[in-house]
């Protein structure tokens, strides 16, 4: 059986770092991952995927990857369940990240955040071209 996940997305907020009673670091975070197709309005939608990472990798992620950071992770899908205070059974599906990698420098991330995620910083104030996927040769 194979349970491998590879995701590339942006952190929706800073990771929440906590420690277990046995002093093991664990961080939870969410990645916004763009879908490969556009909706009926012509816009790309994103999936927001809950993730968890453990030990030294958790501390590293919490220290270095902040909201908006482009991150690549490898890991596996995990399902678990628990009973909440109202006695209801709650089911959770999340990605357990085993490794992560920052995919852009801190400087480029800060520039992206400061420019309001503008994509025209390299090309001046050029107008955006409207190219549909049907026009592409591949």
From Swiss-Prot:
Q: Where is this region: Disordered?
A: 105-138
PROSITE patterns referenced in this protein's UniProt entry, alphabetically: SSB (PS50935)
Q: Which UniProt keywords apply?
A: DNA damage, DNA recombination, DNA repair, DNA replication, DNA-binding
The identity of this protein, by name, is: Single-stranded DNA-binding protein 3
Function per UniProt: Plays an important role in DNA replication, recombination and repair. Binds to ssDNA and to an array of partner proteins to recruit them to their sites of action during DNA metabolism.
Q: Name one GO biological process term.
A: DNA repair
Q: Which gene encodes it?
A: ssb3
Q: Where is the composition biased (Low complexity)?
A: 105-121
A Pfam family of this chain: SSB
The UniProt record lists the SSB domain at 1-104
What InterPro entries does the record point to?
NA-bd_OB-fold, Primosome_PriB/ssb, ssDNA-bd
Q: Where is this motif: Important for interaction with partner proteins?
A: 133-138
Q: Subunit comment for this entry?
A: Homotetramer.
Any GO molecular function: single-stranded DNA binding
